[in-house]
Structures are given as C-alpha cells and as structure tokens.
From Swiss-Prot:
HAMAP family, A to Z: Ribosomal_eL30
NCBIfam families: PRK01018.1
Protein name stated in the entry: Large ribosomal subunit protein eL30
Alphabetized Gene3D superfamilies for the sequence: 3.30.1330.30
Keywords noted in UniProt: Ribonucleoprotein, Ribosomal protein
GO biological process: translation
A Pfam family: Ribosomal_L7Ae
Highest taxon of the lineage: Archaea
Family from the record: Belongs to the eukaryotic ribosomal protein eL30 family.
GO cellular component: cytosolic large ribosomal subunit
Species, as recorded: Sulfurisphaera tokodaii (strain DSM 16993 / JCM 10545 / NBRC 100140 / 7)
GO MF, one example: structural constituent of ribosome
Length: 106
C-alpha cells in the first residue's frame, strides 16, 4: 500500500471539511473575482489555462499549488471518477493546506 503524503492527507481533509470548485472554467472565474483562497492545478493542465490562472492569481495575490500528478491522478485522489485539472479552494475547512502552501512560498 502506498504511503499517504502530507498533501494527499490535507487534500482529503479539505474536501471533507471545506468548500471547493472543480474545473478550470469555474476556477478562473472565481480567481478573477477573488472568491478563492488558493488554487491547485494538475501538471497536465493545458499551458494556456495554466498561464491564465497564474496571471489572475498573481494579480489577486492568491497562492497556487502545482500538483505533480496528472488530472486523472488528482481526480482519483479527490474520489471522483473523472479528471480534475484545477481545484479552487473557497474555504479550507479544517485543512492546513493553505497555511502549508503560504509557508512554503516564503
């Protein structure tokens, strides 16, 4: 059995106790309006969408975590039967993921 990483554990806590949106269109819309606290993107996200998210997130001072796995792996990690290229975090709930990302950026 594979060992669960800190990110995976915190993501599961986030999904259980927080509020998120899935998908690049919804996430970009939420980043533009400043309604998300952070963004998680899969490594396989199309470059044009990645550039848009990074640009809008920089303007809005929203941290972005780049997940090393594919959209399929991120979807599986989230317990979904479909690929997830982006996750917009509206409320982190009991997860420490947002704090860990901010600490890592310093």
């Amino acid at each position: 059995m594979a060992e669960v990483t800190g990110f995976e554990s915190e993501l599961k806590t986030l999904l259980r106790t927080g509020k998120v949106v899935f998908g690049s269109k919804k996430t970009i819309k939420m980043v533009k309006t400043g309604k998300v606290k952070m963004v998680i993107i899969a490594s396989t996200l199309r470059q044009d969408l990645k550039d848009d998210i990074l640009a809008y997130a920089k303007i809005s001072n929203i941290p972005v975590y780049q997940y090393n796995g594919s959209a399929y792996e991120l979807g599986t990690l989230c317990g979904k039967p479909f690929m997830i290229s982006t996750i917009g975090v509206i409320d982190p709930g009991e997860s420490r993921l947002l704090e860990e990302i901010k600490e890592g950026a310093q």
